């Protein structure tokens, strides 16, 4: 179960459903890159993060696609699969998967505008957490841009349920998270986390959270062509 309280404003939303906030947009000071193995495909990939213009948002670019159609705007509307990884794609059928840790790092560092270049269909898994991506962003440096950040306006509670899983958004004058997981496995069992992500708490308290899985699922996943790049240095088993 998860509860997220999002920024709430009465100034009125624009056509995109977002409102201006007191904070300015941010991007990177300079390009930065890394390489690593992709969790599910098992291939070696290179990734770069590039500064982007105000209002351009987050954009993925497949550098291994020679013709047009290599750009994928990062948006919930472009999610094509969320089975064991988040995959987004465009109308040309070009996709990039396992983007969730990088997205968490960009959100946690309050980066609004960036171009993400990758030379394959999946981002590198690194150590299985968002922390290496936070380090990458800090290496690049963060610059404030001359335009207000725009945020989704939550006016009433919203809840999504899928079996025993649920996520709720609740109007608030602040921004906070409350998470709860409950597994039969005693090594994980029931855990809770409530946090207000300000003043570096994302980096210190959230970014190091790592992907975990169960040993009994590994053979089944690999038979299905998944977790081919999984290892004990990029996942907890």
PLM features: residue spans?
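N-terminal amphipathic/basic-hydrophobic helices that include classical n-h-c signal peptides
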Residues: 1-21
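C-terminal regulatory domains involved in ligand/effector binding and gene-expression control
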Residues: 14-112, 117-237
């Amino acid at each position: 179960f998860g509860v997220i309280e999002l920024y709430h404003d009465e100034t009125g939303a624009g056509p995109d459903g977002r409102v201006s906030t007191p904070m300015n947009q941010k991007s990177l000071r300079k390009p930065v890159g890394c390489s690593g193995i992709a969790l599910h495909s098992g291939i070696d990939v290179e990734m770069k993060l590039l500064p982007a213009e105000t209002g351009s948002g987050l954009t993925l670019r497949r550098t291994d696609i020679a013709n047009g159609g290599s750009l994928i705007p990062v948006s919930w509307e472009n999610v094509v699969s969320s089975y064991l990884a988040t995959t987004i794609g465009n109308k040309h059928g070009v996709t990039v998967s396992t983007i969730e840790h990088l997205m968490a790092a960009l959100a946690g560092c309050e980066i609004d505008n960036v171009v993400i270049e990758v030379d394959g269909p999946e981002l590198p898994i690194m150590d299985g957490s968002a922390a290496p991506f936070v380090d990458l962003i800090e290496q690049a440096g963060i610059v404030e841009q001359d335009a207000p950040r725009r945020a989704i306006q939550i006016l009433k509670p919203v809840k999504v349920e899928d079996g025993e899983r649920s996520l709720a958004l609740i109007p608030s004058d602040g921004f906070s998270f409350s998470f709860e997981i409950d597994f039969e496995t005693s090594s994980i069992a029931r855990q809770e986390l409530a946090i207000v992500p300000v003043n570096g708490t994302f980096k210190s308290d959230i970014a190091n959270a790592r992907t975990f899985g169960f040993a009994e699922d590994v053979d089944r996943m690999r038979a299905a062509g998944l977790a081919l790049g999984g290892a004990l240095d990029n996942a907890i088993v």
